[in-house]
Amino acid sequence: MSDERYQQRQQKVKDRVDARVAQAQEERGIIIVFTGNGKGKTTAAFGTAARAVGHGKNVGVVQFIKGTWPNGERNLLEPHGVEFQVMATGFTWETQNREADTAACMAVWQHGKRMLADPLLDMVVLDELTYMVAYDYLPLEEVISALNARPGHQTVIITGRGCHRDILDLVDTVSELRPVKHAFDAGVKAQMGIDY
């Protein structure tokens, strides 16, 4: 391809991008869902949270399922003022106690509702929330109500597999991560700094 043809093609791309950017004038918080069976949902959420913190935004995090064990994202973000509230039971397949898991979910969800109502928070991450709805630990209607009542500038990120259709219908952006290949399938164990 000649330099002239390349320049013409890139100019067409630029014109299309510029037109789309010019059309996007609304400023408000959005709701993002990272879902699917692939690796990287929580990683994507925390990458976005780190970006927000880097721009001086206030961020709150509620982690369902993963428990209180140390992780890199918390080690990085907590010293920068990010509040973490973590479901104390950890992985539900380890506890195998529906009553205790439901109670732990509801306890940490109270912090989630507080964060979603807080006008000082620019972003709230609800990590693994989808499971709480799917397992009936958390009423869907309560989640939707809290999302709808949040301050208009606040962005929310929800992660987890199998996001409920009613939540997907409500949100602004959905990214579905699809597994192509994963080291764990080849017997490589989860690694600090990569997987947690």
Give the location of each predicted region.
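Extreme N-terminal, non-catalytic leader segments
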Residues: 1-30
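Conserved P-loop
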Residues: 30-117
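Short gly/ser/thr-rich secondary-structure transition/capping motifs
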Residues: 14-17, 105-110, 156-159
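Conserved RecA-like P-loop NTPase ATPase core
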Residues: 42, 125, 171
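Generic detector of well-ordered alpha-helical packing
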Residues: 64, 128-129
